[in-house]
Structures are given as C-alpha cells and as structure tokens.
Curated annotation (Swiss-Prot):
Conjugation of reduced glutathione to a wide number of exogenous and endogenous hydrophobic electrophiles. GST isoenzymes appear to play a central role in the parasite detoxification system. Other functions are also suspected including a role in increasing the solubility of haematin in the parasite gut. Homodimer. GO terms for biological process: glutathione metabolic process. Signal peptide: none annotated. InterPro entries: Glutathione-S-Trfase_C-like (IPR010987), Glutathione-S-Trfase_C_sf (IPR036282), Glutathione_S-Trfase (IPR040079), Glutathione_S-Trfase_N (IPR004045), GST_C (IPR004046), GST_superfamily (IPR050213), Thioredoxin-like_sf (IPR036249). SUPFAM superfamilies: GST C-terminal domain-like, Thioredoxin-like. Substrate binds at residue 111. It comes from the Eukaryota. It holds the Pfam family GST_C_3. Residues 85-195 form the GST C-terminal domain. This is Glutathione S-transferase class-mu 26 kDa isozyme. It comes from Schistosoma mansoni. Its EC number is 2.5.1.18.
C-alpha cells in the first residue's frame, strides 16, 4: 500500500515533500482537504492514529508522522539523503534553516494586511539571502555537494527545469498551482492567482 500524504489543497508547507517524492518516483496517495473541509479534517484527525494530529501528515505503514520537516527528513533518510557523516548532516540542517528563514519571511508578510508595505523591506533583504545560495551553488552541483538532498527541494525553484521528474510533476494534473499560501493570505491566497 502506498504511503498517504495529507494536507490542505495548497502548496504550502508540504510542496517540498511532494517534489521529493516525485523526484524519487515513490508512489504515494494524497488526501487533500479543500478550504471548506475544516469539519472533515476535524472529524478525521483523531482517527488516523497520529501522535500529534496535524496537517501535513504522512502515513507509511506503521510510521505515522506530522510536521512538514519531520516528514521530509523521514523520506530523505529512507533514501539515504540525510548525509553520510555528522558534518554533512549538520550542513543539511543549516541549509534547512536558511531556506526556512526565507519561507517564513514570505509567510510572515503573505498573511499581513500590510503586505504591499512589508514586501518592500523583504525584497530589499532577499538578494542578500539568495546570494548565499548562489555562492554555495557556484562550487556545488546541488546545495550540499554533488548529491541532491531534501533542502534542494525546499529551494526547488532553482532546480525544477533541470530535474525531469520534477518537470513532469509540474506539468501533471497532480501539481497544485494555486494557492501558494492558505486561502486567507493577502499574498498567494484566494481561489485564483491575481490577474
């Protein structure tokens, strides 16, 4: 039986997990909850056997996880993608944190009614944050060397054209194009992209 990945029907926190699963060619079943499925989720959440019921969740046999980073790390570990020594594992954790700084920066302003004002400061800081990744990629094939790791999927925009399984997924009907954030986000929310 294929593992089950449950989340809202948005890209959100689980998109890097989807990209990693697609890259690996690992079959999975997705349980998507639409914006009006709050009651459905509340009725299901305590029946799944999860220690900490939440979205996203990932059920792989007797492994039942919640929290996006725990899920991503579990899948990476299953496929020997967490680094081969303490130094590599620490660098991968560092990359996770650096990418999450950017992601949380976007989320912090995406749900704020003052988005247009706040985005100016964020966009001024963004080149400096991205420069660190550019410097790292200038001497590595991937973020942590010559082997793809899960932080690469967290920063997938830099890689999607070069990885055929990801390109295929992005062109499939399984790829969720919108919303980027939750439906209520000032930026990246709603039912359709801005025109």
């Amino acid at each position: 039986m294929a593992p089950k990945l449950g989340y809202w029907k948005i890209k959100g926190l689980v998109q890097p997990t989807r990209l990693l699963l697609e890259y690996l060619g690992e079959a999975y079943e997705e349980r998507l909850y639409d914006r009006n499925d709050g009651d459905v989720w509340r009725n299901e959440k305590f029946k799944l056997g999860l220690d900490f019921p939440n979205l996203p969740y990932y059920i792989d046999g007797d492994v039942k996880l919640t929290q996006s980073m725990a899920i991503l790390r579990y899948i990476a570990d299953k496929h020997n993608m967490l680094g081969g020594c303490p130094k590599e594992r620490a660098e991968i954790s560092m990359l996770e944190g650096a990418i999450l700084d950017i992601r949380y920066g976007v989320s912090r302003i995406a749900y704020n009614k003052e988005f247009e004002t706040l985005k100016v400061d964020f966009l001024n800081q963004l080149p400096g944050m991205l420069k660190m990744f550019e410097d790292r990629l200038s001497h590595n094939t991937y973020l942590n060397g010559d082997k793809v790791t899960h932080p690469d999927f967290m920063l997938y925009d830099a890689l999607d054209v070069n990885l055929p399984p990801i390109k295929n997924y992005l062109n499939s009907n399984r790829y969720i194009k919108w919303p980027l954030q939750g439906w209520s986000a000032t930026f990246g929310g709603g039912d359709a992209p801005p025109k």
